UniProtKB/Swiss-Prot annotation:
A GO MF label: zinc ion binding
Matches recorded under CDD domains: DnaJ, DnaJ_C, DnaJ_zf
Protein name per Swiss-Prot or TrEMBL: Chaperone protein DnaJ
Family, as annotated: Belongs to the DnaJ family.
Biological source species: Burkholderia vietnamiensis (strain G4 / LMG 22486) (Burkholderia cepacia (strain R1808))
Entries under Pfam families matching the protein: DnaJ (PF00226), DnaJ_C (PF01556), DnaJ_CXXCXGXG (PF00684)
Gene Ontology CC: cytoplasm
Amino acid sequence: MAKRDYYEVLGVAKNASDDEIKKAYRKLAMKYHPDRNPDNKDAEEHFKEAKEAYEMLSDGQKRAAYDQYGHAGVDPNMAGAGGQGFGGFADAFGDIFGDIFGQAAGGAARGGRGGPQVYRGADLRYSMEITLEQAAHGYDTQIRVPSWVSCEVCHGSGAKPGTKPETCPTCHGQGTVRMSQGFFSIQQTCPKCHGTGTYIPEPCAHCHGSGKVKETKTLEVKIPAGIDDGMRIRSAGNGEPGINGGPPGDLYVEIHIKPHAVFERDGDDLHCQMPIPFTTAALGGEIEVPTLAGRASFPVPEGTQSGKTFRLRGKGIKGLRSSIAGDLYVHVQVETPVKLTDQQRDLLKQFEKSLAEGGARHSPQSKSWFDRMKSFFE
């Protein structure tokens, strides 16, 4: 049966404080303690599960390893040989590929043959919402992201001031141990020091032995002009710090563009709906439309129908990989007047009568519709 997440067992968040973890454990321990639940196997299992979770999460080093690698980081059996997990396979062949490429299987580089494993830090993702105008023109901004930094109290050693990490007695500072499985000799991460080659008898109270603390970091981010929704900006080296001297990961800023009140974006092109008076549609005229660069005007020919699309070249967005801007497509919607006065009604009736008497032509759409209706009734 797969182990449950330790945070889930205690019912706390992953960023829970030591006090919150201790309080949650005490509550569960009192509830499921064997003395309170004699001959209750289910309560006994819950008690053992809570005890194990507390032992791992109350220890700074073990908690850091668990946060990074899950159960495999704190349970040596999960990375063993004999097909019990992918970690065992990686460790079995790590020395061979490490000697050739300088990197062990599974992405863990080694400081040297038999030395502690070196891991690249995890990448981080930051979701950022910007306006269409900001995406079109680009701009510089700052973001604040939580980040792990070296502990100022122990200077990153993880040890209580006045003490220092000691050589791991299990692996003798190698970071790995060898296990014999029949004809095979398999090398795996040391279960006591988790590959560091050292252990900390007296952990730093400030960082709980991890050698790092979380703080908010302010970063400068340059949003390039023409960026589109869903694109990511890479900030090299601003991810999680590496382990055992490994390189840090990267930060990826994922861009999301807010819906615009006027425009819809389609690649480098923009679309907008433009209402126009029915008199302008019938008589023609000049209309003014908004663009991201200001206002622009263009002529509307007489007899313009609702739904007609006009293309304004170069009034869209200049994309990241384009030297010219896209176009703006204006979709006109002819407005029908409402709440007419008596005088306006009379004028429209006279106008309607003049159309019939004067033989004014219908629009192409209505003419086609009338022709189809005529053939339908014949």
